[in-house]
A protein has these predicted regions:
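Adenosine-nucleotide cofactor-binding segment
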Residues: 131-159
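Hydrophobic beta-strand scaffold residues
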Residues: 30, 75, 136-138, 163, ...
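A conserved regulatory-domain signal marking ACT and ACT-like small-molecule sensing domains
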Residues: 1-87
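Short, glycine-rich nucleotide/cofactor-binding loops
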Residues: 10, 89-98
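Short internal beta-strands
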Residues: 114-125
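Donor/substrate-binding cores of folate-linked one-carbon enzymes
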Residues: 123, 148-150, 159-283
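Histidine-anchored nucleotide/phosphate-binding helix
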Residues: 97-108
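Short, conserved loop/helix-junction motifs that constitute active-site signature segments
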Residues: 109-114, 179-182
Length: 283
């Protein structure tokens, strides 16, 4: 089975050794390994993807828990094969409900083979939507909308989340959160076509460039901001010359963005694609 081990904590010598020695001693094949020392923060981060005999998964979890105690690393052992039939999703939201509603409706209609385990928000705007679909809502933002990142990680663990879906979640996840759920577990919707229109105002930037084709991008999040675009899906629409910016944004938010994210999430949960190193590959 495919197993992803992530480790994050204070930097020191020899942190990777006990992890690598254990998994190789179990006869696992290492398919991918990444290690980073963030010198400025004195932080060590590691991802190790292995192919492991399913009967050894729980033993590996217990062994990694012991390694975590001795090294002060936060270690997670996750396999997409455990809940392959219905992976558990966390929908992260801020203000706009359209993309989350489309995901929840697709699950309810049986078009998306997953379970919405929790909705996490740094604002309460989407809480009524969570209540409508019977999904627990967890608020992690303060009065200014600043999220408690530690609380988010704790919630993702508590709800046993397989994939984190940033459904127009208007905050940048810190590298520590990205590392703890690395390996293609964080899916983001960007409301513009990457790499042409990054940033917070892609509609306005495309409009200023006199574009007639607009779009959205669904991609994996990786800890390194300069690692490129790990694109899962892109969806576009074309408007007539003279179409107002407000009409373009309305169509994008209500139709194009939800469709783009839904198809991207479907490709991931149906195991059509996965993240390998920094590339999206067909499985």
């Amino acid at each position: 089975m495919d197993v992803v081990i992530t480790a994050l904590g204070p930097d020191n010598v020899g942190l990777a050794d006990p992890i690598i020695h254990y998994v190789t001693g179990q006869g696992a094949r290492i398919a991918e390994i990444q290690m980073y020392d963030h010198d400025e923060e004195q932080l060590f981060a590691m991802l190790c993807r292995i192919e492991l005999d399913p009967s050894r998964l729980e033993l590996t979890r217990k062994a990694m828990a012991l390694v975590a105690e001795h090294t002060r690393l936060a270690i997670r052992v996750w396999s997409p094969d455990e809940r392959a039939e219905r992976p558990r999703l966390a929908l992260c939201t801020t203000y706009l409900p359209q993309t989350s509603r489309t995901i929840l409706q697709a699950i309810a209609d049986g078009h998306l083979r997953a379970d919405a385990a929790v909705m996490i928000g740094n604002r309460r705007k989407c809480e009524p939507l969570a209540n409508e679909f019977g999904v627990p809502f967890e608020m992690i933002g303060d009065d200014e909308g600043t999220p408690d990142e530690r609380a988010m990680v704790q919630l993702l663990d508590r709800y046993q989340i397989d994939y984190v879906v940033l459904a127009r979640y208007m905050r940048v996840l810190p590298p520590s959160t990205c590392w703890q759920f690395a390996g293609g577990r964080i899916i983001n919707l960007h409301h513009g076509l990457l790499p042409s229109f990054p940033g917070l105002r892609p509609y306005q930037d495309a409009f200023a460039s006199r574009m007639l084709t607009y779009g959205a991008t669904c991609h994996f999040i990786v800890p390194e901001l300069d690692a490129g675009n790990q694109i899962i899906n892109q969806q576009t629409y074309t408007v007539a010359p003279g179409t107002s910016l407000s009409a373009i944004i309305e169509r994008g938010q209500n139709e194009n963005e939800p469709a783009c994210l839904l198809e991207g999430v479907r490709r991931v949960v149906d195991r059509e694609v996965k993240l390998h190193f920094h590339r999206v590959v067909v499985t």
